[in-house]
Curated annotation (Swiss-Prot):
The chain crosses the membrane at residues 32-52. The keyword Transmembrane helix applies. F-type ATPases have 2 components, F(1) - the catalytic core - and F(0) - the membrane proton channel. F(1) has five subunits: alpha(3), beta(3), gamma(1), delta(1), epsilon(1). F(0) has three main subunits: a(1), b(2) and c(10-14). The alpha and beta chains form an alternating ring which encloses part of the gamma chain. F(1) is attached to F(0) by a central stalk formed by the gamma and epsilon chains, while a peripheral stalk is formed by the delta and b chains. F(1)F(0) ATP synthase produces ATP from ADP in the presence of a proton or sodium gradient. F-type ATPases consist of two structural domains, F(1) containing the extramembraneous catalytic core and F(0) containing the membrane proton channel, linked together by a central stalk and a peripheral stalk. During catalysis, ATP synthesis in the catalytic domain of F(1) is coupled via a rotary mechanism of the central stalk subunits to proton translocation. It is found in: Cell membrane. The gene is atpF. This is ATP synthase subunit b.
């Protein structure tokens, strides 16, 4: 097999890359031009199509992030406002509950006073009715006792005198005198 380097070295010497002033680091002008044209085409396509899409995606992401932050801030502000509203309603409800408790306490005291007054009034009425009933019963008992005592005194007088007191006038006069004597003996007997 033939060595390619040997063939290149013995062939036409003016076309060898390392001879006749060709440099690896500095290519020929036609190589630079033909390399620069595709580079510029790729750069133009990149600049015209890829970079705007990339910018659009970046802008969209940035807007989404900013929007997310703004929504989060808005949600946080809304939550804070809702919390303040809730705390205000809670404080108002506590105040209202305290007022209701105080009104109930006052109403309870008022009802207690009214019930005591009604009970006292009812008690006084019952006592008065009882007193009247006792007085009526006392009068009835006193009248019955007077009748019985009058009858007993007549019977006793008839028995002692041995005379019958059949005359109604005599009998009522005797009874009246006896009861009058009895009333003078016990004037405070009521």
């Amino acid at each position: 097999m033939a060595n390619p380097i040997y063939i290149l070295a013995h062939a036409n010497a003016e076309y060898l890359p390392l001879e006749s002033g060709n440099s690896i680091l500095l290519p020929k002008a036609y190589d630079i031009v033909w390399s620069l044209i595709p580079f510029l085409i790729i750069l133009f396509v990149f600049w015209k199509f890829v970079l705007p899409k990339f910018q659009e995606v970046l802008t969209e992401r940035e807007d989404r992030i900013k929007g997310g932050i703004q929504r989060a801030e808005a949600a946080q502000a809304e939550a804070k406002a809702a919390l303040e509203k809730y705390n205000a309603q809670l404080a108002e409800a506590r105040t209202e509950a305290a007022e209701i408790r105080e009104q109930a306490r006052e109403r309870g005291k008022q009802i207690e006073v009214e019930m005591k007054a009604k009970a006292e009034e009812e008690s006084n009425r019952i006592i008065e009715a009882g007193t009247k009933q006792l007085m009526a019963q006392r009068e009835q008992v006193v009248n019955e006792l007077r009748r019985e005592m009058g009858q007993n005194s007549i019977n006793l007088a008839e028995h002692l005198l041995g005379d019958q007191l059949s005359d109604d006038v005599k009998r009522s006069g005797t009874i009246d005198r006896f009861l009058a004597d009895l009333d003078t003996v016990a004037p405070n007997g009521k």
